[in-house]
Amino acid sequence: MGVKATVVSDTGAYASLGGPVLERACTHAAGPYHYENFEIEGTAYYTNNPPAGAFRGFGVTQTCFATETLLNMMADKVGITPWEIRYRNAIRPGETLPNGQIVDNSTGLVETLEAVKKKYDAALEEGKPVGIGCAMKNAGLGVGLPDWGRCKLIVEGDSKVHIYSGASCIGQGLGTVLTQMVVTNTDLKHEDIVYERSNTWFAPDSGTTSGSRQTLVTGEACRRACDKVMEDRNAGKT
C-alpha cells in the first residue's frame, strides 16, 4: 500500500512561516497510517493574498482533512466501513512514518479505535449518521536552528520599569507572563512595572509568536534582563 500526495500552499505576499508550515503538511500528509511506499511533494507559492504564518495545527489539519476524506472514499469502494479501513492500516509500534520516525510503544491508535468500536457499530445498526476520523501531530520543539528572544527593561521618567519586547501578544497573556517574571526575579512590585505593547520601532525583535515559544525564549531574555536590573540596584543605582 502506498500514498502519493501533492501539497500546494498559498503563503501570501511574504514567506513568513510558509516553509515550516508546508514541511509539517508534507510530513503528516500520510496521516497516522502505515504505508510501504510514499511520494509526497510540497510547493509554497507567493501570491497577493495576506501572509499565511503560524496557526494552530501548523499545516497538519489541511492534509489530514484530505487524507481522511480519501480513506472514506476508499472504504466505500472496497465495501468496508471507515472504521475497518483505519484499523487495518493504523500505524503500530515499530513501524515507520513517512518522515522516517519509528513509532514507539506510546502509539495508541489501534487501542483508540478498539475503544470506540462497539458504539460505532451500534450507531450504524441503528441507522444513525456517524463519522470517524483520525489525526496526529508529532513534532518536537524546534528544528535544530538557533532561536532567540529579546527584552528591554527601561526605567523611564515615571520611575517605573517599562518592559519592551517585539514578541506579539495574540491572546496567550505574554504581557502578564513577562510582568510576573520581573516581579519574581526582582524586588519590584506589580505597580512598579509597565508592559509596553510590541512595536517595530523601539522593541527588539523576538521572533514569531508561535509554537508556545515566547514564554520560554523571551521569558528567559526577560529573566536575564532582571539579573542586570538587580545588579544595578544592588550597586546603589536607581
Task: Indicate where each model-derived feature is located.
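Gly/Pro-rich active-site capping loops and adjacent beta-alpha segments
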Residues: 1-61, 126-238
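N-terminal leader/propeptide and maturation segments of large enzyme subunits in energy/redox metabolism
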Residues: 51-117, 211-238
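Helix N-cap/coil-helix junction residues
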Residues: 80, 122, 187-188
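Accessory "access/gating" subregions that flank catalytic or transport cores
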Residues: 87-154
